[in-house]
């Protein structure tokens, strides 16, 4: 191929990547909103957007790994609420910071591990197993709070939700660290490559000596821990916990992952695309607020975005198959 033809092919391949198209859409939406609202590009609003989508991005890293292996986790939102309530209750009892932190992360890991065991050892479909866990976690949240929000006096825990390092919120720095770790894990470790191998072909992965069940249990457990981190951040931001924290997060997280190029068929997706997808979701939610669009339209928009992203992925796969 001539240098010119090679250059054209590289440009075409670049624009065929879902995350690049989403990034272009994100930039276009931001430009449009900067004209539609004088508040969009203010420093305060930009920080609000970053804080808003940081939780979705953290959860989407875990959700993406599960989807890439061919599964799905509908319980992430409820687990966020459950770990937040559990952590707030422990903190309110006067437990030392280290004990409180370990208990929050530990309970998230246990929930994720339980999901993984249900799927691999009992053979329950991920959709059903996590749907059941969604109900269990929400019910446990109500039992802990007795339907009344738990208030936590501003302590060390508030640093996670409301603290800053320079001009950046701690929650945003936490998100960037998790995205960075996720990127290295997915691209530079054997375990990360095994996640993709399981999603591409479970049978081939088994023949290659990959312990498929262990990989699936691992990604569910990681997602549980990430949900507990989000629960901790919410307690810090709002100085307390409510049984309905995280309600609806599962759809936002799935949308962010799918928009970012994670295929619901499994075996495909990358962490940087997930970050862009989460950012797009955050900007869209912020746009609804700035433009005074009724809140229920946000739910409609999320559904439209998921269907649209899945449809585009399906069309792209059919075109590639030809």
Where are these regions (language model features)?
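Single transmembrane alpha-helix segments in multi-pass membrane proteins
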Residues: 31-93, 117-124, 257, 261-271, ...
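Alpha-helical transmembrane segments within multi-pass membrane transporters and channels
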Residues: 94-134, 276-277
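Transmembrane helix-bundle core of multi-pass membrane transporters
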Residues: 122, 126-189, 215-218, 237-246
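Transmembrane alpha-helices
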Residues: 211-235, 247
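Transmembrane alpha-helical segments in multi-pass inner-membrane proteins
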Residues: 227, 237-303
